[in-house]
């Protein structure tokens, strides 16, 4: 038994043993408290980012305008997401059932039983009964002839409309289009396809740029290819001949020359020339002179040198038209200032 240790010493010993443990626990708690707001902030940021991505995906999937649904609450976004996933799940289940051969066989068997019961209905005319049974058989086989024919006709019409050239904006463009592709105007559309005037079959093909082109089949015999080339050459020759005839007709048309406007100088010149001309009214050997060039409108009478164009016999004119008119010019007095 130790009797020399006092109470104060005992407290010092206990204090020295307990204090290090408390010092070790306090830093961990302080670190957790300081890191907790940061972790909470990061967690909220992740949630908000995921919600924003969900909103974008849901609006794109449901084909809604993002401008009208820019402000969606978090609950709305989650609700729309759940509904969309449920719809996708139902669609996948329906597709799996439709692809399952057992379910398909069961459906066909039930449909066949219904058709048999329909065929037993009393009071139906034989023609109407046949049409009804034919319609039901087409439905069970998945063949809808009328709808298929309508879709095919619409596709053919759209292809034919795309193959036709656009209307020209000028006669030159029209002639160029006719010379470049004369075979486009002779294409015949039938139920079996498209045919050229010489009987060649062509296949409408969509090019990478989106336009439609008529392509010859690869299995075309060499003789038919030669015939097609000869036909195209003949069409081009006809187009060139038509263009040459149009150019020749345009050259044969008379050209119209614009007459110059009368000015003071031209009026005086014409008065002098008319005075000399009126002196011989009955002469049959008089010449007609060409008018001055319109390019030089401001000229002097002395610079004019008329050129003889042709001799035209003049007819006898009345006396009142050939009498020379005397113009009295008043002499102005001379003033020195």
Curated annotation (Swiss-Prot):
Residues 146-178, 259-311 are annotated as: Disordered. Residues 31-88 form the bHLH domain. GO terms for cellular component: nucleus. CDD domains: bHLH-O_hairy_like. Residues 107-136 form the Orange domain. The keyword DNA damage does not apply. Transcription repression requires formation of a complex with a corepressor protein (Groucho). Interacts with gro (via WPRW motif) and Topors. Pair-rule protein that regulates embryonic segmentation and adult bristle patterning. Transcriptional repressor of genes that require a bHLH protein for their transcription (e.g. ftz). PANTHER family: BASIC HELIX-LOOP-HELIX TRANSCRIPTION FACTOR, HES-RELATED (PTHR10985). This is Protein hairy. It comes from Drosophila melanogaster.
């Amino acid at each position: 038994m130790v009797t020399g240790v006092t109470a104060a010493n005992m407290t010092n010993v206990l204090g020295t043993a307990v204090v290090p443990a408390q010092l070790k626990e306090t830093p961990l708690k302080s670190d957790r408290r300081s890191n907790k707001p940061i972790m909470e902030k990061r967690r909220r940021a992740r949630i908000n980012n995921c919600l924003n991505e969900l909103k974008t995906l849901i609006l794109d999937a449901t084909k809604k305008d993002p401008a009208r649904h820019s402000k969606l609450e978090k609950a709305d976004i989650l609700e729309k997401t759940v509904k969309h996933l449920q719809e996708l799940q139902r669609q996948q289940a329906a597709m799996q059932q439709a692809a399952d051969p057992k379910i398909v066989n069961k459906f066909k068997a039930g449909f066949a039983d219904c058709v048999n019961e329909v065929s037993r209905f009393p009071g139906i005319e034989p023609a109407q009964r046949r049409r009804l049974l034919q319609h039901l058989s087409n439905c069970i086989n998945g063949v809808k002839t009328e709808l298929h024919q309508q879709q095919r006709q619409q596709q053919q019409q759209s292809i034919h409309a795309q193959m036709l050239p656009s209307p020209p904006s000028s006669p030159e463009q029209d002639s160029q289009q006719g010379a470049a592709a004369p075979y486009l105007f002779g294409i015949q559309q039938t139920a079996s396809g498209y045919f050229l005037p010489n009987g060649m079959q062509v296949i409408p093909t969509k090019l990478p740029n989106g336009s439609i082109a008529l392509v010859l089949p690869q299995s075309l015999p060499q003789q038919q290819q030669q015939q097609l080339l000869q036909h195209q050459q003949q069409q081009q020759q006809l187009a060139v001949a038509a263009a040459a005839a149009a150019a020749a007709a345009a050259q044969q048309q008379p050209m119209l020359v614009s007459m110059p406007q009368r000015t003071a100088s031209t009026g005086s010149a014409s008065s002098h020339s008319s005075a000399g001309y009126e002196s011989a009214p009955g002469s049959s050997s008089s010449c007609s002179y060409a008018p001055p060039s319109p390019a030089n409108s401001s000229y002097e009478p002395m610079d004019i040198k008329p050129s003889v164009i042709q001799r035209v016999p003049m007819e006898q004119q009345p006396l009142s038209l050939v009498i020379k008119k005397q113009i009295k010019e008043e002499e102005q007095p001379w003033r020195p200032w």
